[in-house]
Amino acid sequence: MFLAYPSSRELVTLATSADSEQNFSDGEVMAMLTELEVNGKRYPVNYPADTPLLYVLRDELGLTGSKYGCGEGQCGACAVLIGGAPRRSCQIPVSAAAGKPVVTIEGLEKDGRLHPVQQAFLDAGAFQCAYCTSGMIMSSVGLLQTNPNPSQADIVQFLQGNVCRCGTHPRIIDAVRQAAKMMREQGR
């Protein structure tokens, strides 16, 4: 089963209330030109300010690693790093991401080498259907940036907002611990 979400182009024609400050005719929402820094590159994007960052990443930039799960910020499938911290891109308006570095799952790999968290997830087999994996990895990277030697309780607490319906949490926890060790050994 695939979850559908409105395309960002469909959002441009969403109806606004009659008493809106923006007074647009025919119920259109005005798009605005914004510059995003994603995975170290700058992109001009033209969307309504309240368009979820997830839609812009997927529809405009073609970065489909971040997944649409619930659209309510409850599952973590859409997690990206904004300013180094994990955030739910389905809940972040594109205007709030302007001027801040955004990193998606596609931006973790460097020079053909996986990030230690990505490698640890592969080594531990920390996925089944893999729908949640990019969000789990991005949240784990955020954790390890702030806590390079987390306990099992720290990992469980930090990832409690990421849902894995396949039940691979024990392997995910093992992967985060392995990644922490690799990162310490590499001096990251």
Predicted regions and their residues:
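Generic alpha-helix initiation/capping and coil-helix boundary signal
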Residues: 8-9, 133
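N-terminal export signals
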Residues: 1-8
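Cationic, low-complexity basic patches in intrinsically disordered or flexible, solvent-exposed regions
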Residues: 11, 22
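Signature of N-terminal electron-transfer/Fe-S-associated modules in redox systems
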Residues: 2, 23-188
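Ala/Thr-enriched low-complexity intrinsically disordered regions
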Residues: 4, 13-18
